Regions:
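Positively charged, small/polar-rich N-terminal and surface patches that mediate targeting and assembly
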Residues: 1-139
Length: 139
Protein backbone atom coordinates (compact mmCIF):
# COMPACT_ATOMS: atom_id res chain seq x y z
CA UNK A 1 0.00 0.00 0.00
CA UNK A 2 1.45 3.35 -1.02
CA UNK A 3 1.13 6.27 1.38
CA UNK A 4 1.80 9.79 0.07
CA UNK A 5 4.43 11.98 1.71
CA UNK A 6 1.71 14.47 2.66
CA UNK A 7 -0.98 12.71 4.66
CA UNK A 8 -3.55 13.27 7.39
CA UNK A 9 -3.33 11.91 10.93
CA UNK A 10 -6.73 11.02 12.38
CA UNK A 11 -6.92 10.68 16.16
CA UNK A 12 -9.96 9.30 17.93
CA UNK A 13 -10.17 9.72 21.71
CA UNK A 14 -12.53 7.35 23.50
CA UNK A 15 -12.61 4.99 26.47
CA UNK A 16 -11.74 1.31 26.78
CA UNK A 17 -15.24 0.56 28.04
CA UNK A 18 -17.02 2.28 25.10
CA UNK A 19 -18.82 -0.25 22.92
CA UNK A 20 -20.03 -0.70 19.38
CA UNK A 21 -23.10 -2.83 19.89
CA UNK A 22 -23.21 -5.11 22.91
CA UNK A 23 -20.07 -7.20 22.57
CA UNK A 24 -17.34 -5.36 20.66
CA UNK A 25 -15.17 -2.60 22.14
CA UNK A 26 -15.49 0.59 20.08
CA UNK A 27 -11.74 0.79 19.48
CA UNK A 28 -11.78 -2.72 17.95
CA UNK A 29 -14.74 -1.85 15.72
CA UNK A 30 -12.87 1.24 14.48
CA UNK A 31 -9.66 -0.68 13.78
CA UNK A 32 -11.50 -3.49 12.00
CA UNK A 33 -13.46 -1.03 9.85
CA UNK A 34 -10.24 0.84 8.97
CA UNK A 35 -8.68 -2.45 7.90
CA UNK A 36 -11.77 -3.38 5.89
CA UNK A 37 -11.56 -0.02 4.07
CA UNK A 38 -7.84 -0.63 3.31
CA UNK A 39 -6.50 2.32 5.27
CA UNK A 40 -2.72 2.33 5.69
CA UNK A 41 -2.80 1.24 9.32
CA UNK A 42 -4.29 1.88 12.74
CA UNK A 43 -2.77 1.88 16.21
CA UNK A 44 -4.59 1.77 19.54
CA UNK A 45 -2.89 3.50 22.48
CA UNK A 46 -4.16 3.00 26.03
CA UNK A 47 -3.41 5.65 28.60
CA UNK A 48 -3.23 5.13 32.36
CA UNK A 49 -5.60 8.00 33.17
CA UNK A 50 -7.43 10.88 31.49
CA UNK A 51 -10.63 12.90 31.31
CA UNK A 52 -12.83 14.35 28.61
CA UNK A 53 -15.90 16.55 28.16
CA UNK A 54 -17.59 15.30 31.34
CA UNK A 55 -14.44 15.91 33.46
CA UNK A 56 -14.93 12.39 34.87
CA UNK A 57 -11.62 10.58 35.42
CA UNK A 58 -11.10 7.53 33.19
CA UNK A 59 -8.69 4.87 34.45
CA UNK A 60 -8.19 1.17 34.97
CA UNK A 61 -9.66 0.04 38.27
CA UNK A 62 -8.11 -2.58 40.52
CA UNK A 63 -11.01 -5.01 40.36
CA UNK A 64 -11.11 -5.63 36.63
CA UNK A 65 -13.14 -2.71 35.28
CA UNK A 66 -11.17 -0.95 32.56
CA UNK A 67 -12.26 2.59 31.80
CA UNK A 68 -8.80 3.63 30.54
CA UNK A 69 -8.57 6.43 27.98
CA UNK A 70 -7.93 5.09 24.48
CA UNK A 71 -6.55 6.89 21.41
CA UNK A 72 -6.81 5.34 17.95
CA UNK A 73 -4.39 6.81 15.40
CA UNK A 74 -4.81 6.34 11.65
CA UNK A 75 -2.56 8.02 9.08
CA UNK A 76 -3.37 7.96 5.35
CA UNK A 77 -4.14 10.13 2.34
CA UNK A 78 -6.64 12.90 2.99
CA UNK A 79 -9.21 11.38 0.60
CA UNK A 80 -9.13 8.03 2.40
CA UNK A 81 -9.42 9.64 5.83
CA UNK A 82 -12.33 11.79 4.61
CA UNK A 83 -14.08 8.67 3.31
CA UNK A 84 -13.67 7.08 6.76
CA UNK A 85 -15.24 9.95 8.73
CA UNK A 86 -18.88 8.99 7.96
CA UNK A 87 -18.13 5.52 9.38
CA UNK A 88 -17.01 7.11 12.65
CA UNK A 89 -20.10 9.30 12.70
CA UNK A 90 -22.23 6.18 12.39
CA UNK A 91 -20.60 4.05 15.10
CA UNK A 92 -19.50 6.63 17.70
CA UNK A 93 -21.87 8.10 20.28
CA UNK A 94 -19.28 10.31 21.96
CA UNK A 95 -15.58 11.02 21.92
CA UNK A 96 -13.16 13.49 20.39
CA UNK A 97 -11.92 13.28 16.80
CA UNK A 98 -9.01 15.38 15.55
CA UNK A 99 -7.29 15.75 12.19
CA UNK A 100 -3.85 17.14 11.48
CA UNK A 101 -1.47 17.26 8.57
CA UNK A 102 1.36 14.74 8.70
CA UNK A 103 4.50 14.21 6.69
CA UNK A 104 5.20 10.50 6.16
CA UNK A 105 8.93 9.80 6.26
CA UNK A 106 8.80 6.03 6.02
CA UNK A 107 6.16 3.36 5.47
CA UNK A 108 6.90 -0.31 4.99
CA UNK A 109 10.39 -1.37 3.98
CA UNK A 110 13.10 1.21 4.42
CA UNK A 111 14.87 2.44 1.31
CA UNK A 112 18.60 2.70 1.88
CA UNK A 113 19.65 6.21 2.85
CA UNK A 114 16.15 7.70 2.60
CA UNK A 115 15.93 9.12 6.11
CA UNK A 116 19.47 10.50 5.96
CA UNK A 117 18.73 12.29 2.65
CA UNK A 118 15.51 13.69 4.09
CA UNK A 119 17.26 14.89 7.24
CA UNK A 120 19.95 16.59 5.16
CA UNK A 121 17.43 18.27 2.88
CA UNK A 122 15.45 19.58 5.87
CA UNK A 123 18.68 20.74 7.52
CA UNK A 124 19.50 22.86 4.45
CA UNK A 125 16.07 24.56 4.66
CA UNK A 126 15.62 25.21 8.40
CA UNK A 127 13.36 28.25 8.01
CA UNK A 128 10.43 26.55 6.35
CA UNK A 129 11.09 22.90 7.19
CA UNK A 130 9.87 21.58 3.86
CA UNK A 131 11.48 19.70 1.04
CA UNK A 132 11.26 21.40 -2.34
CA UNK A 133 10.18 19.50 -5.46
CA UNK A 134 13.76 18.96 -6.75
CA UNK A 135 14.77 17.33 -3.47
CA UNK A 136 11.62 15.18 -3.36
CA UNK A 137 12.66 13.67 -6.69
CA UNK A 138 15.99 12.65 -5.14
CA UNK A 139 14.29 10.95 -2.20
Amino acid sequence: MEVPHEAVLLRIFTGADDRCGVEQPLYMAIVMKAREMHLAGATVLKGPVGFGQSSRMHQRHFFGADDSPVVIEICDAEEKINAFLPVLDEIMESGLITLEKARVLQYGHKRSGYLERLKNSLHHHPHHGSVDSREKQNL
